[in-house]
């Protein structure tokens, strides 16, 4: 019998970021805070939100949830390849060696590179399309929510539909960070993952 996936509407807070590494190779980890149907597709980009659109000069990847779906509290790690990032400049093709611990990943179709900056950056997660995104999570490790139009590759405003401290988080300008599980309540909620007080950091590889 042919398996036909039934797609549930994914919502803000159904995943949360729990780690990032901007020192090569780039890496980030999410946790599912709700069941994800198999075949669900999520974009991850390092493009900031200007208030009206994604910054055009940054790239991304498109992740597909594996057959059988993913239960709540599943961690998924994405690791860059090639020069350390996820997609190449200027074509936006997938770097050789990019991997994901569960599911599959392809280039997003954005003709730009996705490579995390050690000067601060952000990762936005959304469904829909690049032109019309529905945001579900964001980690900003540039120290503040801001958009000046200069050095825009490393800036973002709070994406629409998200609330800082609830389903997205702003963190210190550090190369690497992760949730400290010892600081989390049991059970942890999505807002616990998006509480900057529950994160630890370093600037080493």
What is the predicted function of each stretch?
Residues 46-59:
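Short, basic/aromatic beta-hairpin or loop at an interaction surface
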Residues 41, 109-205:
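Conserved beta-structured recognition patch
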Residues 6-48, 112-119:
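A structural motif detector for short, solvent-exposed N-terminal "entry" segments of globular domains
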Residues 60-88:
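Intrinsically disordered, low-complexity Pro/Gly/Ser/Thr-rich segments with frequent PxxP/GP/PP motifs
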């Amino acid at each position: 019998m042919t398996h036909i996936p039934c797609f549930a509407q994914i919502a803000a807070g159904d995943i949360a970021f729990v780690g990032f590494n901007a020192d090569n190779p780039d890496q980030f980890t999410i946790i599912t805070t709700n069941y994800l149907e198999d075949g669900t597709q999520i974009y991850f980009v390092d493009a900031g939100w200007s208030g009206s659109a994604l910054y055009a000069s940054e790239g991304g990847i498109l992740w597909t949830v594996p057959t059988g779906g993913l239960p709540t509290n599943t961690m998924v790690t994405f690791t860059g390849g090639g020069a350390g990032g996820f997609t190449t400049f200027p074509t936006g093709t997938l770097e050789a060696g990019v991997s994901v611990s569960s599911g599959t990943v392809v280039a997003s179709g954005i003709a730009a590179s996705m490579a995390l900056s050690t000067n601060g950056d952000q990762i936005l997660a959304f469904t829909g399309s690049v032109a019309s995104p529905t945001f579900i999570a964001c980690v900003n490790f540039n120290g503040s929510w801001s958009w000046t139009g200069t050095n825009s590759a490393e800036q973002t405003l709070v994406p629409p539909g998200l609330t800082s401290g609830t389903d997205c988080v702003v963190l210190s300008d550090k190369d690497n960070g992760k949730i400290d599980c010892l600081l989390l309540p049991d059970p942890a909620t999505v807002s616990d993952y998006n509480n900057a007080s529950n994160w630890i950091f370093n600037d080493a590889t």
